[in-house]
Structure formats: C-alpha cells, structure tokens
C-alpha cells in the first residue's frame, strides 16, 4: 500500500471538488486536470497541471479528445512492480487516483426539449474510459466517482500517511463499475427506442435498469427461498422503498410486498383513509372523519383476515388509533406519513410490530412495472389510470344517486388493487365485502357476499365494482339478489346490452368506466 502522489481530477459535478483538491494538495499530491475543472482549481490558486501540458498533446475537437492518451492510460493501467520498466521507457508516470464524474447524460435526455444532438454531446467517452482503467487497476489506483465519498477518502488518507487501504480501493472500484454500467445502460435505453427513419418506440430493444440492494433477508416468499430487497438508486416518491422504520423486526419479503400494496391503495384517496392488506389483497378499506374512524371501519370489514395484516394510513397515526390497533389485533406492519410521539409510545409496547413512516404521500409517479416469467421479463407502464365522475358513462335507465356515485368511485379505486377477478362491495365509504383472485367473476361476487355475511354486515344498499366487464348477465342477477343497487365496471363485452338489460330489470344503476384494471 503506497501513498497517493498523483491524482487526475476531471468532474462535471463540481460540488465539493475545490475543498477536496485543496486537501489533496496539502498532502503533497500532484494534481492533473482538464477543461472546466482545471479552470476552477487554477483560479482558486491551487497548483495544477493541465492534461494537455502533461501529455504534450492538445485538447481537440471541442473537447471530445482530452484524456485519451498513453501517458494517461498507461499511468492508470500500469502495474506497479510489473510494468515499471515499460513506463520508464516511455516516460509514463503512475497516476494513483482518478476523480471523475460523467457528463450528465440521464439529466440531459430527461429534459422534454432534448434533441438528439444534445444527447450525443452528453455521452462521455474519456470519463468512463479513465474510470474503467483505474477500476481495473484498483490494486494500485483509487477511483473516485461520487462527491459523497470525498470526506471518507480524505479522512482515511490523513490518518494513514496519504494511503488508502485495499478494501477502500476495492469498494470504490465496485462502485465505479456499477456507475459505468448504469451510464451505458441509460445510453443504450435512450438510443434503443429510436429508428433510423425518425420513428420512436416506447420500449428499447434491449432494456437495461439497475437497482441497489437495500436489505438482505432471512428468506423469501417461503423459508426455502433466498431473497434480498433492492430499490431504485434515488427513489423520490413516498413508498415502501423510501420509508423509515421506527421500530420492530426487520421487514420480511412478504411484509414489503404487502406494505407496498397497502400504501399504494391508500395514496389514491384524498379523504382520510385506512387500508388493511393480507396477502397483497385489501381485506378492509374505509374513509372516515378522522384516522380512528377510518381504521375502525376498515377493520370491521373483515376482522378475521385483518389478523396478522398490514395497515396503511394516508394521515398521521395518532394515539387513539394506535391504542385501538394494539388492543384489537395482531399486526405485522403499520405505515403512515407520520406518527405522533404518543402513538409511538403506544406501539412501543409491542416491540415486534414494524412501525414505518413514509413522509408526505404526494402523487404517484409514472414508472415501469415488471413481471418475471421463465426466461423473460414483462415490462409495462405502471397502472395509474383513473376516471373522474364526468368520464363515467351511465348506461342504465336509472342514474346513480349522489351517494351511490360517491360509493361507486370509492369501490372502483379499491377494485384496481384487488387481484383479478375482483369484486368489491361498498357502502357509505367502507368496504362491505371483497372477492379476490377467483377464476370466475360470479364466484368472486359470491365470496364478497359471504365475507359480508360472516361479519354481520348488510349488503342491501351497497354498490359493486368489478375490475373487468361482466361477460354474462348472471353477475348482475346475483348482485340484485344480494341487494346491490349500483354497479361500476369497464364495459366492453359483446353482451354489454344483455348486462345492461339485466340491470334495468332489477332497477340497478350502472356506469361504465371504459378502463379495465386486471391485476395478476
């Protein structure tokens, strides 16, 4: 392990670089630099040599060629103790550290007015080449790509006579290969959606993405399966990926999946709402005048299934609600935008309960959804589709009342998050019964009715939502028999008129959404 004696610095993100370079200079590190970075350092009075002066070869082609030179890459790739004679013969000095971050390609192409020419000029060539050279030779060279690493690198060098341990250099090399892979993947994705005839495709012909391991797990969906939790590099939306755990055991694979399902549903409500999920399906959902009422009503939908469930709120958890949860049921996870101190103290009595805060919910952001199949991957837009009351089409002789319309819209939101075939019964802003995951839509409806009856909830006067159209009138006949007064579903069946006629016969109001919400 030898001290760093020569460093090459060339960065697009100049945050912290001046202070970092000053500290290197104080440790007698010779600094080489290029372009804008050279200007920043030299104007600050730091001793710095421009790369063109060092190589004896000028920057050219508007800066496209700056560091692609044997004196640079020989200094990075040269193996100390093995290539010394060759380096000396050609006048190549070792470069012990590279500090490089890349042209902002991803930020550039994310701009709505980005042209192809703008994108091309933000493809870094010299930067990734230096990074890969240095990372390959990490045994002798430290490679720094992230300004957040400056402090720890300086601290280690200052306490070790200018040296960095092999463990640190190895970690920095891994980080570098991760970054160059992500960078090349972003470029590939961007160009992969284009064709030479100026036509674009929504999805690239080769899809590249990168996730960062957040948590290792004891096991996966089942104890015989290994698992880990990966997140996007910089997720911004309030989510299970950004949530902070305040107490409780480590989240399991199933905890994370179920908490995600609960939180994403509760986000869709503007009113104070609570969602209880079991095995990725909502078993109780309600809005209320306050947090306690929303929980109380959601719990009453199906207390049996709520046992061992996940509870999500879209308002801060208060003491009264926390106490009710602890007194009533065994719960795996509670997640809310915030938690009062009194509520924290209540939950603390049950140390195994996982308590999470996710911050202000904001809006659900467009993204991709993935489904793994053997030998492949299905990629689609995230289902953020919704309909307003004005977009609903009343297709029956009787239009829904104001109260029915409010319940229909509530039920439609819930149905979107229930596994298909999905049937949801709702009354007064509360789920009465949920039928999920059945091969027959009629059987999902029967299950919703059975669940309601088991909990002593009255179906008559409820509305019904179906995630897809009714292919036959039997579903409407069954709904009428149960006492359903209004139905919401996508429509679009060959037998729509038959289904509408059945609703009219029973005096049921029916609206079409024109949008399906299958969930598998």
From Swiss-Prot:
GO terms for molecular function: IMP cyclohydrolase activity; phosphoribosylaminoimidazolecarboxamide formyltransferase activity. Residues 1-145 form the MGS-like domain. Its EC number is 2.1.2.3, 3.5.4.10. One of its GO terms (cellular component) is cytosol. The keyword Zinc does not apply. Keywords: Hydrolase, Multifunctional enzyme, Purine biosynthesis, Transferase. GO terms for biological process: 'de novo' IMP biosynthetic process. It comes from the Bacteria. It catalyses: (6R)-10-formyltetrahydrofolate + 5-amino-1-(5-phospho-beta-D-ribosyl)imidazole-4-carboxamide = 5-formamido-1-(5-phospho-D-ribosyl)imidazole-4-carboxamide + (6S)-5,6,7,8-tetrahydrofolate; IMP + H2O = 5-formamido-1-(5-phospho-D-ribosyl)imidazole-4-carboxamide. The IMP cyclohydrolase activity resides in the N-terminal region. The gene is purH. The keyword Hydrolase applies. This is Bifunctional purine biosynthesis protein PurH. Pathway: Purine metabolism; IMP biosynthesis via de novo pathway; 5-formamido-1-(5-phospho-D-ribosyl)imidazole-4-carboxamide from 5-amino-1-(5-phospho-D-ribosyl)imidazole-4-carboxamide (10-formyl THF route): step 1/1; Purine metabolism; IMP biosynthesis via de novo pathway; IMP from 5-formamido-1-(5-phospho-D-ribosyl)imidazole-4-carboxamide: step 1/1. PANTHER family: BIFUNCTIONAL PURINE BIOSYNTHESIS PROTEIN ATIC, BIFUNCTIONAL PURINE BIOSYNTHESIS PROTEIN PURH. SUPFAM superfamilies: Cytidine deaminase-like, Methylglyoxal synthase-like. Belongs to the PurH family.
């Amino acid at each position: 392990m030898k001290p760093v004696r020569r460093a090459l610095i060339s960065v697009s993100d100049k945050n912290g670089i001046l202070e970092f370079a000053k500290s290197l200079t104080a440790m007698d590190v010779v600094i080489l630099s290029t372009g804008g970075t050279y200007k920043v350092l030299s104007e600050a009075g730091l001793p710095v040599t421009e790369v063109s002066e060092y190589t004896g070869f000028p920057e050219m082609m508007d800066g496209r060629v700056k560091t692609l030179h044997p004196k640079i890459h020989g200094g990075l790739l040269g193996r100390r103790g093995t290539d010394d004679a060759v380096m000396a013969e050609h006048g190549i000095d070792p470069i012990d550290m590279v500090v490089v971050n890349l042209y902002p390609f991803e930020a550039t192409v994310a701009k709505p007015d980005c042209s192809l020419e703008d994108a091309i000029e933000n493809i870094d060539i010299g930067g990734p080449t230096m990074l890969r050279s240095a990372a390959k030779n990490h045994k002798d060279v430290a490679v720094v790509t992230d300004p957040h690493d400056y402090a720890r690198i300086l601290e280690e060098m200052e306490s070790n006579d200018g040296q960095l341990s092999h463990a640190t250099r190895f970690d920095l090399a891994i980080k570098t290969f991760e970054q160059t892979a992500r960078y090349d993947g972003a470029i590939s994705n961007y160009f992969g959606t284009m064709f030479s005839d100026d036509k674009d495709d929504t999805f690239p012909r080769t899809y590249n993405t990168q996730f960062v391991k957040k948590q290792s797990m004891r096991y996966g969906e089942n104890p015989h399966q290994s698992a880990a939790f990966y997140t996007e590099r910089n997720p911004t939306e309030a989510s299970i990926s950004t949530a902070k755990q305040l107490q409780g055991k480590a989240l399991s694979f199933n905890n994370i999946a179920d908490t995600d399902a609960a939180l994403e549903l509760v986000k869709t409500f503007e009113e104070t709402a609570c969602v209880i999920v079991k095995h990725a399906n909502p078993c109780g959902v309600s809005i209320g005048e306050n947090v306690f009422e929303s929980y109380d009503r959601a719990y009453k939908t199906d207390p049996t299934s709520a046992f061992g469930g996940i509870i999500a709120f879209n308002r801060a958890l208060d003491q009264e609600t926390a106490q009710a949860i602890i007194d009533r049921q065994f719960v795996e996870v509670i997640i809310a935008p915030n938690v009062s101190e009194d509520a924290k103290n209540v939950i603390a009595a049950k140390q195994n309960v996982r308590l999470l805060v996710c911050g202000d919910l904001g809006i659900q952001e467009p993204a991709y959804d993935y489904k793994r199949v053997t030998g492949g991957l299905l990629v689609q837009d995230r289902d953020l589709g919704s309909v307003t009351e004005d977009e609903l089409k009343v297709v029956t002789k009787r239009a829904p009342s104001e109260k029915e319309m409010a319940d229909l819209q509530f039920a439609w939101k819930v149905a979107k998050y229930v596994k298909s075939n999905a049937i949801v019964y709702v009354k007064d802003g509360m789920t009465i019964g949920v039928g999920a995951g059945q091969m027959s839509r009629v059987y999902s409806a029967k299950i919703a009715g059975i669940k309601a009856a088991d909990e002593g909830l009255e179906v008559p006067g409820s509305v019904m939502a179906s995630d897809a159209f009714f292919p036959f009138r039997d579903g409407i006949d069954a709904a009428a028999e149960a006492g359903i007064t209004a139905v919401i579903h996508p429509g679009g069946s060959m037998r729509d008129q038959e289904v509408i006629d059945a609703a009219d016969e029973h005096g049921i109001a029916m609206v079409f959404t024109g949008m399906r919400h299958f969930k598998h």
